């Protein structure tokens, strides 16, 4: 059963990597101007991102407690205005949330692999598998919602669903593996994701039509109707 849960969560981590790669392709095809397509294809930021993802997919010989898959090129790529034309400013927050969720998943994989003997019951392992399977569709939904035209309300809803699924995975992993102290990084990661999510929520609210009091013209029309 321990092997099953390790494989299941390992597959989930692989799906995150594939989602990032798909996101690069989507952004390149959908956001780059046609006349700059060849230049975008050969641009260094994209090459660096794809290269980093391929390097990270290789098996690591590090200790399980040190297993972390992060992308140090993300910040530099987002600052490059020629890489993506995102006038809304929401794309970077979506990528940040995906990155945080991916990092959390990788570390949870390490903790699960290193806590096999501490597992409570086979039911606990089953819970981890069930929750983990719910995350990959959420990742796909977030990536699909990043296709233009961007809908802030859709981005808000789908990133919220993804973060809730990852938070649920954190809870069941903590319970199954008897994780207690030294886990401040989990709460810090979730807090950071919430900060990015708050930006998406504000954008979603701003995209809704005003429901305030009617202006002078509307007031005069109402009086005429009366």
From Swiss-Prot:
Top-level division of the source organism's lineage: Eukaryota
Subcellular compartments: Endoplasmic reticulum membrane; Cell membrane; Secreted; Secreted, Extracellular exosome
Region annotated Required for interaction with MYRF, chain positions: 1-88
Alphabetically list the UniProt keywords: Cell membrane, Endoplasmic reticulum, Membrane, Secreted, Transmembrane, Transmembrane helix
Main subcellular location: endoplasmic reticulum
Identify the stretch annotated as signal peptide in this record.
none
Residue ranges in the Cytoplasmic topological domain are 1-3
UniProt membrane topology term: Single-pass type II membrane protein
Q: Which GO terms describe its cellular component?
A: endoplasmic reticulum; endoplasmic reticulum membrane; extracellular exosome; extracellular space; plasma membrane
Q: What is this protein called?
A: Transmembrane protein 98
The scientific name of the source species is Bos taurus
């Amino acid at each position: 059963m321990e092997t099953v849960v390790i494989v299941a969560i390992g597959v989930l981590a692989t799906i995150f990597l594939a989602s990032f790669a798909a996101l690069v392709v989507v952004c390149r095809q959908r956001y780059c101007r046609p006349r700059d397509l060849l230049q975008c294809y050969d641009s260094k930021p994209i090459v660096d991102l794809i290269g980093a993802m391929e390097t990270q997919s290789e098996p690591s010989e590090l200790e399980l407690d040190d297993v972390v898959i992060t992308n140090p090129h993300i910040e530099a790529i987002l600052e490059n205005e020629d890489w993506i034309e995102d006038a809304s400013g929401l794309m970077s927050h979506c990528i940040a949330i995906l990155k945080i969720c991916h990092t959390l998943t990788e570390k949870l994989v390490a903790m699960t692999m290193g806590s096999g003997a501490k597992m409570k019951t086979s039911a606990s392992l089953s819970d981890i598998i069930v929750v983990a399977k719910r995350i990959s569709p959420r990742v796909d939904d977030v990536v699909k919602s990043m296709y233009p035209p961007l809908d802030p309300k859709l981005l808000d809803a789908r990133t919220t669903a993804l973060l809730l699924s990852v938070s649920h995975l954190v809870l069941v992993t903590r319970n199954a593996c008897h994780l207690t102290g030294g886990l401040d990084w989990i709460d810090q990661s979730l807090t950071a994701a919430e900060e990015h999510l708050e930006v998406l929520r504000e954008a979603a609210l701003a995209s809704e039509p005003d429901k305030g009091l009617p202006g002078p013209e509307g007031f005069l029309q109402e009086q005429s109707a009366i």
